[in-house]
Amino acid sequence: MAAKDVVFGGEARARMVEGVNILANAVKVTLGPKGRNVVLERSFGAPTVTKDGVSVAKEIELKDKLQNMGAQLVKEVASKTNDIAGDGTTTATVLAQAIVREGAKYVAAGLNPMDLKRGIDKAVAALVEELKKQSKATTTSKEIAQVGSISANSDESVGSIIAEAMDKVGKEGVITVEEGKSLANELDVVEGMQFDRGYLSPYFINNPEKQVALLDNPFVLLFDKKISNIRDLLPTLEAVAKAGRPLLIIAEDVEGEALATLVVNTIRGILKVVAVKAPGFGDRRKAMLEDIAILTGGKVIAEEVGLALDKVTLEDLGQAVRIEIGKENTTIIDGAGQAAEIEARVKQIRIQIEEATSDYDREKLQERVAKLAGGVAVIKVGAATEVEMKEKKARVEDALHATRAAVEEGIVAGGGVALLRAKQAVGDLKTGDAEQDAGIKLIMKAIEAPLREIVANAGGEPSVVVNAVLNGSGNYGFNAANDTYGDMLEMGILDPTKVTRTALQNAASVASLLLTTEAMIAESPKAEGGPAMPDMGGMGGMGGMGM
């Protein structure tokens, strides 16, 4: 086992604070509408240019092990805030740095770190309550667009395309971000339920122009096994033919004689039928078949529920207004399922989302909710170069997260104003314990940091602006984009409450850990340069070559 260095007390904290400062100073230059760019080296290809705080934080690894520990803890603040709220990473980093810097002074002056921590926790709890009171629900498309624009570093085109996407697929719908092919951002919306399986034979195509099979007012047969024997299908086909309507068969697979018979019937015009494979694999396939059954008002024909293929009646089949089957996708529009049953299914999947442990499972479950609840929108990001594309895509994804957070918990005045107003409302919070009160005072000073940083990045004088904002009331604040004062909400400068709240809570949590650190253990640095090479026999005069 390698030897370790152990560092105690003030020295340990001082080294950690140095690491915190290095990381925070690199991240905080990106804050605000006039935030600067940071260039990240890439081992291959062109460097990446970004204004995204979490991207900068993720790149930082320091040579000094103790400094690096401090930096990594603050990196945790940024990434945790990003995971929960999707934005606010730079704000969280700036707050963490301010709390650590103020707190380190108090600890150095001999105050008890544990009492300081208790004071910090009380102040944060009071501020969070106040933020919730200030919060205003996000209802209009305009507000959604403003939140998106602010998060995408004041890019209005991003805000408006996110608002449009939410309009089309609803607040719960799935919105994905992809790299586009053109210079401008584009929005594609798929209404109804779409899954990634197409027709099993091109002979099913009845619209040669679009190369798709269109079924109007069809029945839907859902079967969880392979169909290879046409005899099992005959009763269903006869009943559907009598009703004079088309049929979509979704099964694990349709092969051999069964597929050939369906194709022949379609070509001869005896029956309009299309077969597709069921989406997904294993348990996910079962769940998705069940989703389609609920959406279309049918049943999944499976032996485990006592239903056999040759005993199927028209009542067991699902129905839809229209189904479009392409080479790779099938879209069911306006299924005949009961709204209450669909709603119950969505609730059930939401519970599974909360319990899901992996991001992959969570994402797949969210897709299922969207398919049942409304549709899927795809934002295609346009850019001139690959470097710009990467930077823009990251910003659009951030903006999308922030917008979802705004819809979830509402909005507060942006630009660091909400925290100052919360500070004023909490007023003179006292606990009766001098050291805990010092913790409260420390937080009340630290929450000015985001506004100070925004002003500094815009080339202004932070103290002057902070005093001017504190003398105002309500949503009165400073617009760094054009150096004016006014109502932040009216100027469209807003932050999702969830983002501001999460940034404050995570920053205080990690800063408290740093302040209550009393010892640090890190591997000792290895001595530079190995031992000299031994004499090389037979090569006189070259012995002891220093390497």
UniProtKB/Swiss-Prot annotation:
Major location category of this protein: cytoplasm
Residues where ATP binds: 30-33, 51, 87-91, 415, 479-481, 495
Record-level GO cellular component terms: cytoplasm
PROSITE patterns attached to this UniProt entry: CHAPERONINS_CPN60
Cellular localization per UniProt: Cytoplasm
Superkingdom to which the source organism belongs: Bacteria
GO molecular function: ATP binding; ATP-dependent protein folding chaperone; isomerase activity; unfolded protein binding
Enzyme Commission number(s) of this protein: 5.6.1.7
CDD domains: GroEL (cd03344)
Catalytic activity field: ATP + H2O + a folded polypeptide = ADP + phosphate + an unfolded polypeptide
Listed InterPro entries: Chaperonin_Cpn60_CS, Cpn60/GroEL, Cpn60/GroEL/TCP-1, GroEL-like_apical_dom_sf, GROEL-like_equatorial_sf, TCP-1-like_intermed_sf
Keywords per UniProt: ATP-binding, Chaperone, Cytoplasm, Isomerase, Nucleotide-binding
One of the protein's GO biological processes: protein refolding
The family this protein is said to belong to: Belongs to the chaperonin (HSP60) family.
Function in brief: Together with its co-chaperonin GroES, plays an essential role in assisting protein folding. The GroEL-GroES system forms a nano-cage that allows encapsulation of the non-native substrate proteins and provides a physical environment optimized to promote and accelerate protein folding.
Assembly and binders: Forms a cylinder of 14 subunits composed of two heptameric rings stacked back-to-back. Interacts with the co-chaperonin GroES.
The protein, known as: Chaperonin GroEL
Chain's gene name: groEL
